[in-house]
A protein has these predicted regions:
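Cell-envelope and extracellular/periplasmic
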Residues: 22-474
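Positively charged n-region of N-terminal signal peptides that target proteins for export
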Residues: 1-5
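Bacterial N-terminal signal peptides
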Residues: 7-17
């Protein structure tokens, strides 16, 4: 490989540049082995790290090829020998979580010590305050990467056992919490409060990125213009660090591919799960919210983000162990809605119910389940509406307030001849009955199936919004 091309590829690894398609003609190069004996650790390993409880704990790094390596974590010790590329790997036995007496508890943690030796020389690195708890990967594009803003949230930032990783692990405090992603911070804050164990958040998002750049890159895969751009610098350095699951807030860059997004999302999830070799770990998606101007003259909808929201909801049944936070009620005209607080809480609700088996937590708002034609009306049934449906209005970060006499916007019904008409909705316990004076033989229903359905007001009585839906697919 010519030197300029090698430099460009290495720049790509570091996230500094994207290669022109014409230059993507060779396999991804392996870095040369380290020239120093001092151990260089994988990205997840430094002071204040959080390791996943109840799973074997892999630790890896690089040193001189052939060097002897001793690694200890608390009372456990392992040995290894660096390979020809300088890499060494060890694995510790699974450990229980460090239980917290309260959310502001500050466990001492364990020490991770790495000793490398070669030709009579010896180097040691020590990392302190290593905690055992719950670890989540938080990825996507700019709406995931928006930093935490404490305004109006009333979240106490002093959480010594809540930590987040970018270049290194940081401990949650008043002067650090604003450097964490907003969605992931609220998610982790809520989890820790409910579980009373340490929580570690591995943040890895890049603004403006399509899903293709995040797909798993297998060793020896031929490069393409989309590969390596995000997966290699952001995800690959984390692969193997045991974790409970992943959060995914992305889709804005793929809205024109809404009808194809489900297989694209499946490729992402399957690739990451295969890389981690942990089975079907939890994968929680943020459904896209509103943006732009409302399109009130098209009852059939289908414009803008309608298809990709539909694909995100279909993932719940098409891909095992996936979840979704609905955000249709907290969007804005802008690309980046300010309210990341409710997004984090809704992701946490799904995780608490499904991943941590806390059945007293309602995981989601109403999700379309089935329709039944009843004369000139259609009865729509939902999952997660067992306590009933309601109409409500949400303002800012406050819980939605019931508005039982309000009209229900963004409902449309399809006639037997294929035409679409605006419709009325009537709540009947946990069902929604939809009809229109212009349609005597209805066949399908759509709700909020457009780019910016402002004022969506259908919730379950637990205060979580209904997802947009189409009973006839795309």
């Amino acid at each position: 490989m010519k030197a300029p091309l090698l430099s460009a590829v290495l720049a790509l690894i570091l996230g500094q540049a994207a290669l022109p398609a014409a230059e993507l003609a060779t396999d991804f190069p392996k870095p040369p082995p380290p020239l120093e004996l001092a151990p260089r650790m994988g990205r997840p390993f430094n002071d204040n790290a959080v390791f996943q409880q109840q799973m074997p704990i892999p630790v890896w790094g690089w040193t001189l090829a052939g060097a002897e390596v001793q690694v200890s974590l608390g009372q456990q010790q392992r040995t290894a020998k660096a390979g020809a590329d300088g890499r060494f790997d060890v694995k510790f036995d699974a450990l229980p979580a460090d239980k917290l007496k309260s959310v502001d508890d500050a466990p001492v943690g364990r020490t991770l010590t790495v000793v490398t030796s070669f030709d009579g020389k010896r180097e040691t690195k020590t990392f302190s305050s290593i905690l055992i708890g719950e670890v989540w990967l938080c990825s996507g594009q700019s709406n995931m990467a928006v930093r935490y803003n404490s305004k109006g949230t009333n979240l106490d930032p002093k959480r010594p056992a809540l930590r987040f990783l970018e270049d290194d692990w940081k401990v949650s405090a008043a002067d650090t919490c604003g450097r964490c992603y907003g969605v992931s911070y609220v998610f982790g804050h809520k989890l820790q409060g409910e579980l009373l164990v340490p929580v570690g958040l591995m943040n890895a998002a890049v603004a403006g990125t399509g899903i293709e750049g995040w797909w798993y890159v297998a060793p020896g895969d031929p490069p393409t213009p989309t590969k390596y751009q995000n997966y290699m610098p952001k995800i690959e350095p984390l692969v193997g660090h045991a974790m409970r699951g992943a959060l995914w807030y992305q889709g804005e860059a793929n809205v024109k591919q809404g009808k194809d997004y489900l297989p694209m999302l499946k490729k992402l999830i399957d690739g990451w799960r295969g890389a981690w070799k942990q089975g079907d770990f939890a994968f929680l998606i943020v459904q896209l919210s509103t943006i732009g101007e409302s399109a009130t003259d098209k009852p059939e909808g289908g414009d803008g983000r309608a298809a990709i929201r539909n694909a995100q909801m279909e993932a719940l049944t098409a891909i095992p162990n996936t979840g979704m936070a609905v955000t249709i009620d907290i969007g804005e005209k802008r690309e980046h809605p300010q309210n990341k607080y409710d997004v984090g809480l809704r992701l946490a609700a799904w995780a608490l119910n499904k991943t941590y088996d806390k059945k007293d937590v309602v995981p989601s708002g109403p999700l379309y389940k089935a329709q039944m034609i009843e004369g000139g009306a259609i009865r729509v049934k939902f999952d997660h509406a067992q306590h009933g449906l309601m109409l409500a209005k949400k303002e800012g970060l406050a819980p939605p307030v019931p508005t039982p006499d309000a009209p229900m916007p963004w409902l449309s019904i399809q006639a037997k001849d294929g035409s679409w008409h605006w419709a009325d909705g009537k709540i009947d316990g946990s069902d929604l009955i939809v009809s229109s004076k212009d349609v005597s033989e209805p066949v399908a229903v759509r709700y909020a199936y457009t780019i910016h359905p402002a004022g969506c007001n259908l919730y379950n009585k637990d205060g979580l919004p209904a997802s947009p839906f189409s009973t006839c697919g795309y």
